[in-house]
Amino acid sequence: MGALLPARASHRTVSDTGTHAAGFVGNSLSCSNCHLDAGRLANSAPLWGAYVRYPAYRAKTGKVNNYTERLQGCFMYSMDGTAPPAGSEALVALETYSYWMAEGAPVGAQLPGAGYPEIPAPPLPPDFARGEAVFADNCALCHGDDGQGQRVAGRQVFPPLWGPQSYNWGAACTSWTTPLASSRRTCHSDAAGVSPTSRPGTWRCS
């Protein structure tokens, strides 16, 4: 039971990053907006899938990054903020949580359910008019007509998809494949009508 306490505390950093990593977040997003079910859910960029893949070379930085450096990049780009220093409470919390979920997984392996599913190229070229209609019919209910999400009692309950309170140029979501794969996993229920965020999906718990 005692071993779970650090992981539970770290869970709060993933779910409410702006509060528990204050000073390093420059927008309204939390880690769990992209890493669903607080980083647990398979095929939704789970943290347990990423942890065992590092150290790894990243073209964005032009060097081999360790997991700490990868998390720092998330704060700089996806959170549009600043990188917490190595050994800071925020990074140690995220590293502890990721390690706890990935414990026992083979290091260096591409685990089933890591990352996002591959999305095939669309049969038609991108079209703003079609996209506007799809957004109005499928996305605006949660994210708003302007894509800026929704806040309740001062807390962001649905994330902004673009703009000053969202990610910047360096985030993975600037590539069309990442938000498409994420939205398919995040926003759609399965055939049984079960929300994907209700399913277990960690290396330890799946």
Where are these regions (language model features)?
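Sequence/structural segment immediately N-terminal to covalent heme-attachment motifs in c-type
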Residues: 1-38, 122-158
